[in-house]
Regions:
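P-loop (Walker A) phosphate-binding loop of NTP-binding proteins
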Residues: 14-16
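Short beta-strand-centered segment that lines the nucleotide-binding/catalytic pocket of NTP-utilizing
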Residues: 34-49
Length: 112
């Protein structure tokens, strides 16, 4: 998936606690060439990383948000779809109806 990234993509991750949303983002970032430690941004809500190709990976965690108004008030949506960004959103189900139509949605499930 990371090999097909050109910029402007938005990836929505949906799954319960412990289903692998952050693990997916770590592997995705590594595949993009990011060497920094990627962790869950639950308390800061967003982390930004630059790839060797000059793209910026924005990693969002919406666990503590209630709705799209919370996200929009932070100014986060201003760079969605920008050709120099790739956005991965954890807990995207909270704003699914407000995401652009070309968003890639990935559902993750925990093993029993």
């Amino acid at each position: 998936m990371a090999k097909k990234i050109r910029g402007g993509e938005i990836i929505a991750l949906i799954g319960e606690l412990g289903s692998g949303k952050t693990t997916f983002t770590k592997a995705f970032g590594k595949a993009l060439g990011i060497r920094q430690q990627i962790s869950s941004p639950t308390f800061v809500m967003m982390q930004q990383f630059e790839t060797p190709k000059g793209l910026f990976l924005y990693h969002l965690d919406l666990y503590r948000t209630k709705n799209f108004a919370d996200v929009k008030s932070l100014g986060i949506t201003e760079w969605w779809g920008h050709p120099k960004t790739v956005t991965v959103i954890e807990w995207a189900d909270k704003i699914l109806d407000s995401l652009p139509k070309n968003t890639t949605i990935i559902y993750l499930h925990r093993d029993a």
